[in-house]
């Protein structure tokens, strides 16, 4: 049976921590930032954890499951 291939676009967007959580970046921060509040843009810079509903799908894309 061949090896699982990693989805390269998912590998650039997600990272798995040692405890198994999946870290992602926020959306809506690349353009049209002039109309967004400063504290909103600051919050969008932080990383976020992928929800449990999407966790298995992302792990399959990363070739971890």
From Swiss-Prot:
Stored InterPro entries: Ribosomal_bL35, Ribosomal_bL35-like, Ribosomal_bL35_CS, Ribosomal_bL35_sf
Annotated GO biological process: translation
Keyword Ribonucleoprotein listed: yes
Domain of life: Bacteria
Gene Ontology molecular functions: structural constituent of ribosome
UniProt keyword Ion transport present: no
A single cellular component GO annotation: cytosolic large ribosomal subunit
Alphabetical list of PROSITE patterns matching this protein: RIBOSOMAL_L35
UniProtKB keywords: Ribonucleoprotein, Ribosomal protein
Pfam family, one: Ribosomal_L35p
Similarity comment text for this entry: Belongs to the bacterial ribosomal protein bL35 family.
Protein name (record): Large ribosomal subunit protein bL35
Originating species: Thermotoga neapolitana (strain ATCC 49049 / DSM 4359 / NBRC 107923 / NS-E)
């Amino acid at each position: 049976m061949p090896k699982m291939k990693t989805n390269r676009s998912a590998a650039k967007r997600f990272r798995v921590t040692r405890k198994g959580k999946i870290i992602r970046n926020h959306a809506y921060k690349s353009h049209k930032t002039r109309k967004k509040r400063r504290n909103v843009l600051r919050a969008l810079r932080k990383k976020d954890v992928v929800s449990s509903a999407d966790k298995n799908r992302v792990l399959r894309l990363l070739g971890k499951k």
